[in-house]
Every structure is written in C-alpha cells, then in structure tokens.
From Swiss-Prot:
It comes from Xenopus laevis (African clawed frog). The lineage of its organism: Eukaryota, Metazoa, Chordata, Craniata, Vertebrata. This is Mitochondrial import inner membrane translocase subunit Tim9. The gene is timm9. The twin CX3C motif contains 4 conserved Cys residues that form 2 disulfide bonds in the mitochondrial intermembrane space. However, during the transit of TIMM9 from cytoplasm into mitochondrion, the Cys residues probably coordinate zinc, thereby preventing folding and allowing its transfer across mitochondrial outer membrane. The keyword Transport applies. A motif (Twin CX3C motif) lies at residues 28-52.
C-alpha cells in the first residue's frame, strides 16, 4: 500500500507546483506577448506560447530522465563497492 503524504507535504508540493506554474507562465508571457493594442490573443502569440510550454515540458522530462540515470549509476556503483568490500580476500 502506498504511503499517504502528510498534509504539510501536500501543501509544500502544491506551493512548489504553483511557483513553477507561475514562473513558466511569466516567462512564456514575457517571451511571447509583445502587442497590447488588442484584447484578443493573436495567432503568433498562441503559437509562441504553445512552443514555450512544449519546450519546457520536454526539458523537464529530459532532466528527470537524466536524474534517474544518474541515480541508477550511483546505486550500481555503491552496490559494486559494497560487493567488493563484503568479499573475503
């Protein structure tokens, strides 16, 4: 059975999510929206925003994969080292 997150951990995780969301929104807005003469979102702004979001998601996924690979390598190295230390000479 999966362990439940405490309420404080859930709040912390949600705050981190909101911080990330707000930063992403601000960065993409500043990069993509240049014309404030109309209330409508222009096609170029929409396309730019979509590309900005896609790029961020791909970057996040790639970083996560690299982070997992790094931890697997570290665990394998520790296991190999422990195996060598545990063997009689």
């Amino acid at each position: 059975m999966a362990a439940q997150m405490s309420e404080s951990d859930q709040i912390k995780q949600f705050k981190e999510f909101l911080g990330t969301y707000n930063k992403l929104t601000e960065n993409c807005f500043l990069d993509c929206v240049k014309d404030f003469t109309t209330r409508e979102v222009k096609a170029e702004e929409m396309t730019c925003s979509e590309h900005c979001l896609q790029k961020y998601l791909k970057m996040t996924q790639r970083i996560s994969m690299r982070f997992q690979e790094y931890h697997i390598q570290q665990n394998e190295a520790l296991a190999a080292k422990a195996g060598l230390l545990g063997q009689p000479r």
